[in-house]
């Protein structure tokens, strides 16, 4: 199979350029995410994400630690954006997501971001992975347009925390090939407590429904690598704090039982988690096994589950090495060992 990303056609008919221009206007009264800060980021005003109108790229690399159908044999061309529109106490990428004064030093132009995409394509990566793009979603579209103009022809992954604006996602329709959202919590209160965010579950459900409407529940493959579709990630938290059953119930009853889920066990008490008695320890095997049973209870069998020991192997070190922050990652397809039918 030879897959042609749909953003190529959007570029050819002029639609991609128009959407990039429309998206950038949103920054003048920012509604890039459900915070709806309505500040003018084009005039150096900062809202919750503490970001201006220029994208912050903290790191970019060929990454082998995604689901095997995304990393393949040549890696996902991941671009890690700095800052964030959440404040997770346990964030594993906190060195770049919650250190805004330092990350502002890594602002780049739209043209430079486009060139990074081209560089990752030249490295023979399978795709372009936009990691934590939400708060820069209004500016990234311009870079995609410029990159396609320079010859970008790879599928694009939107790897997000799920707290996205439906308005922005509609502008990304047929631009994004693979949606890779987190669905962190099945409860608004847990999200407020541990990610300092209002109405997370409500807003994430709306966003993921929009993603589902765009790409459906089927994964499209080119060889062994996915080139189009939706994969929902869910990180299991200690003491059931992610309200996982509500997450599975939503997916099964409001999306489809055929949706692919990446159920993650890689939680460890990073960032400020050691200060909270309920999350200051790794996940127990019994907790993870119970969560798998809940997933199966709702007829969700498509996707991947991690080995419980994954918390020992997935630990990024952005402060030590921005070029290769995952140098100690133990890349293996057994990290996500089971795919359903």
What are these regions (language model features)?
Residues 192-222:
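Anionic-ligand binding region
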Residues 95-105, 193-198, 275-282:
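Short glycine-enriched, charge-decorated loop/helix-capping segments at active-site entrances
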Residues 81, 132-134, 158-162, 183, ...:
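A cross-domain feature marking catalytic cores of carbohydrate-active enzymes
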Residues 173-188, 258-267:
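Non-cysteine beta-strand/loop elements that form the S-adenosyl-L-methionine
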